């Protein structure tokens, strides 16, 4: 006998999605996804100056910010056969790469992690063993006993002092949580680190696009002047700062995010 399960709304994408799944003998035989909201952006931009459309379509979302605006200016440029300057293309690529990294880190840690990381279990972890687990995954400088002791204290404080903390309410202790306490502690430490990474990487968009979310774009190029001697333009100080942000983010991705994604997927697959 076929059973249909409906999840409506899917809460972690702002509630604009409905999912249906047909299950027969414990196996999903069919599935359907439905977008349940129209924002009317296409209607809003109708008959407007094509050079201004990027500013409207970008407001469709404040999370996946900038990509809608970028697609808009590229569409206008393609239609008019405009070839933008190489520097403008580089700036756009840097901005989009920054938000892509932020999205991946956010999705993995903030939107997924607590589905399989037990916060309460982490409070019972041995920081020494947690450090050993972390050191087996990468050479990240923070993989120390003292670091995980401090993280454990911070999490306990969150839970004990704020009833509104996201750590204060959950299905903690449910048998579906299978990860060892030490792995949970490592994951929660990286969860908190990911918040700092997100805060830093979006500065690339702010420096080149003026703000985040919804940075500025321009049909035909980018609205940011480059002058190494002007404090109000893209000078060497700002460009070096961007390079530092990129380097720090690369370190986090290579030594934290990627090892976590691979190892936790492996652990879940072998439960």
Locate predicted features.
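Active-site bordering "gate/hinge" segments
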Residues: 1-268
């Amino acid at each position: 006998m076929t059973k249909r399960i409906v999840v409506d709304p899917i809460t972690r994408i702002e509630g604009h999605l409905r999912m249906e799944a047909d299950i027969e003998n414990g196996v999903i035989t069919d599935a359907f996804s439905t977008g349940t909201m129209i924002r009317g952006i296409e209607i809003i931009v109708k008959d407007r100056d094509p050079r201004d459309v990027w500013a409207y379509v970008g407001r469709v979302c404040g999370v996946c910010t900038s990509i809608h605006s970028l697609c808009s200016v590229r569409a206008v440029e393609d239609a008019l056969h405009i070839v933008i300057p190489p520097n403008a293309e580089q700036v756009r690529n840097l901005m989009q790469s920054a938000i892509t990294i932020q999205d991946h880190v956010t999705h993995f840690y903030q939107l997924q992690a607590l589905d399989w990381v037990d916060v309460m279990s982490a409070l019972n972890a041995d920081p020494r063993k947690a450090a050993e687990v972390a050191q087996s995954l990468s050479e990240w400088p923070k993989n120390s006993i003292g670091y995980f002791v401090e993280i454990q204290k911070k999490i306990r404080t969150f839970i004990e002092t704020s009833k509104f903390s996201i750590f204060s309410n959950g299905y903690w202790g449910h048998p579906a949580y299978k990860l060892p306490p030490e792995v949970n502690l490592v994951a929660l430490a990286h969860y908190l680190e990911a918040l700092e990474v997100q805060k830093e990487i979006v500065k690339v968009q702010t420096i080149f696009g003026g703000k985040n979310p919804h940075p500025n774009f321009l049909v035909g190029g980018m609205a940011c002047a480059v002058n190494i001697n002007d404090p109000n333009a893209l000078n060497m100080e700002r460009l070096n700062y961007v390079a530092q942000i990129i380097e720090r983010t690369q370190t986090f991705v290579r030594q934290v995010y990627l090892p976590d994604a691979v190892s936790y997927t492996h652990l879940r697959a072998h439960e």
